[in-house]
Design a protein with these regions (language model features):
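Extended acidic low-complexity intrinsically disordered regions
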Residues: 1-14, 126
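Catalytic micro-motifs at enzyme active sites that drive phosphoryl/nucleotidyl and oxygen chemistry
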Residues: 17
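Short, surface-exposed, charged amphipathic helix/loop patches that serve as local interaction elements
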Residues: 14, 22-127
Length: 127
């Protein structure tokens, strides 16, 4: 089997069962695919290139929350505004796990605020 075939065959999306006491449930939080993460980053980045947390937290909760019994997604995009009315602690609990499982780091959030040419020149200076 080629390396390509091995990579494409592996299940590489991490999961974690998260207890959300504010909601009285456990949610399976899954990491996002590359496409999902890119979509959310594009959607949550304001015109100035800064992360809009009011936008990104519910988007991450929607994208990463699954029913541990059925495997179905818990929320749909139309739930975004109603999620913003829920406990900030609960949203933070789920979103932070979703971000960690999806490779969001402080460094990746900081990169969103940089001009792409600035980032490219920094990357070149690492060589």
């Amino acid at each position: 089997m080629s390396i390509r075939d091995q990579i494409l065959a592996v299940q590489d999306i991490p999961t974690q069962l998260v207890e959300v006491p504010e909601w009285g449930v456990k949610i399976e939080v899954r990491g996002m695919t590359g496409a999902e993460r890119t979509r959310i980053m594009d959607k949550a980045t304001a015109d100035a290139g800064e992360m809009n947390l009011q936008m990104i937290y519910p988007e991450i909760v929607i994208a990463t929350s699954f029913d541990p019994l059925t495997g179905e997604q818990v929320f749909v995009p139309e739930d975004r505004d109603i999620l913003l009315s829920k406990s900030a602690t609960a949203l933070d609990r789920v979103a932070m796990v979703g971000m960690r499982l999806s490779g969001f780091t402080k460094e990746s959030a900081d990169e969103l605020g940089k001009d792409s040419s600035e980032t490219a020149s920094e990357d070149l200076s690492l060589n």
